[in-house]
Amino acid sequence: MFDARRPKALITGTPGVGKTTHCRKLAAFLNTKCISVGELLAGTPYVTYIPELDTYEIVDLDGAVKRVHSVVEPGHIIDTHVVELVPDPEVVIVLRKAPDVLFAELKRRGWPLKKILDNVWAEILDVVLIKARERWGEVAQIDVTRRRPEETFELLKKCVAGGRCHSDVVDWLGYSEESGFLEFIERLSRSESF
């Protein structure tokens, strides 16, 4: 059933895959708003900042949900990796990135090692994809690793235009094992825990 309050799309995925960039670009193309949930909640009483990890943690889930729902309007594009916070969108797109490439990107950004490891493991283990599927069933999955941003944008446009959503098959655990990255990230994780 159609709900007039539904946002147009949710662009989700592990931090560092390009959600915010694509949300803003898609919103500009559609002449609507990109609601970046992280930016919306930063500095509110619903989250607390953890300086050593350079991240926010949700401390009031109900309050955060109400805040997000109070801002989202029909047609908006939402960007977040915390799928529990958003109203049901018309379409859900999970952006994916190879864990070794994601590791390099987050390191380039100067993120703390623990935060990098948490996010790389989340990508290897499909955490955001699984949460999205648990909530909405089948969702589109786009591997951005070897795609130019313009190619990803074209796939997103087709998906939100009501056309058939492109969906890649991703197996980052197998990929990481075959490439040797899994051994590297396990070793790094063990050394970080001491």
From Swiss-Prot:
This is Putative adenylate kinase. It is an enzyme of class 2 (transferase). Its EC number is 2.7.4.3. Broad-specificity nucleoside monophosphate (NMP) kinase that catalyzes the reversible transfer of the terminal phosphate group between nucleoside triphosphates and monophosphates. Also has ATPase activity. Involved in the late maturation steps of the 30S ribosomal particles, specifically 16S rRNA maturation. While NMP activity is not required for ribosome maturation, ATPase activity is. Associates transiently with small ribosomal subunit protein uS11. ATP hydrolysis breaks the interaction with uS11. It comes from the Archaea. Residues 36-59 are annotated as: NMP. Interacts with uS11. Not a structural component of 40S pre-ribosomes, but transiently interacts with them by binding to uS11. It comes from Pyrobaculum aerophilum (strain ATCC 51768 / DSM 7523 / JCM 9630 / CIP 104966 / NBRC 100827 / IM2).
